[in-house]
Amino acid sequence: MPKGCLVITVSGLAGSGTTTLCRNLAKHYGFKHIYAGLIFRQMAKEMGMTLEEFQKYVELHPEIDREIDRRQIEAAKECNVVIEGRLAGWMVKNADLKIWLDAPIMERAKRVAKREGISVEEAFVKIAEREKQNRKRYLNLYGIDIEDKSIYDLIINTAHWGPDGVFAIVKAAIDHLSPSGDAGEDEKEKEVG
């Protein structure tokens, strides 16, 4: 792992494996794990709402999104932190490594169904509706298209690897991270000089 202060963001849609990866990174490297989804779930519980109800409530109360974003940005000021959230890569612009995890929706629905003890069909409908609402909300609130992956340094389809495989890929990326932030520039300087 490069020496110094690392800030890593991990983003992805429901069931893509972001929480598992972040827990593994936090355990292996001793990183602090900041989880926007947990903040969101806690706020829903505090208000006595289901996630679906709270999702609709948040659409009418953008200050909730802004508070979650503020907490992520504040957390990025710390050293050796992994920040998990759908918009973490967008919010933490100066992150050393921005990761997006993805998988086909049916694969994600199977994972969510298993995790939440519901049918795959129910999970599929919940995921599809939530993603539609989130995409609209992010576009309206921030002008961010969640489907734009151009800001990410590493994109992994987690349907191809289990948690250990995904961790191994990300670990290799972290362990070989260029301290200058631009490995291509270092190579050009060597070639020219």
Swiss-Prot record:
Its main location: cytoplasm. It catalyses: CMP + ATP = CDP + ADP; dCMP + ATP = dCDP + ADP. InterPro entries: Cyt_kin_arch (IPR011892), Cytidylate_kinase_dom (IPR011994), P-loop_NTPase (IPR027417). ATP binds at G12, L13, A14, G15, S16, G17, T18, T19, T20. One of its GO terms (cellular component) is cytoplasm. Its EC number is 2.7.4.25. It holds the Pfam family Cytidylate_kin2. CDD domains: CMPK. Keywords: ATP-binding, Cytoplasm, Kinase, Nucleotide-binding, Transferase. The keyword ATP-binding applies. GO terms for molecular function: ATP binding; CMP kinase activity; dCMP kinase activity. GO terms for biological process: pyrimidine nucleotide metabolic process. The keyword Kinase applies. It is found in: Cytoplasm. Transmembrane segments: none annotated. Belongs to the cytidylate kinase family. Type 2 subfamily. HAMAP family: Cytidyl_kinase_type2. This is Cytidylate kinase. It comes from Thermococcus kodakarensis (strain ATCC BAA-918 / JCM 12380 / KOD1) (Pyrococcus kodakaraensis (strain KOD1)).
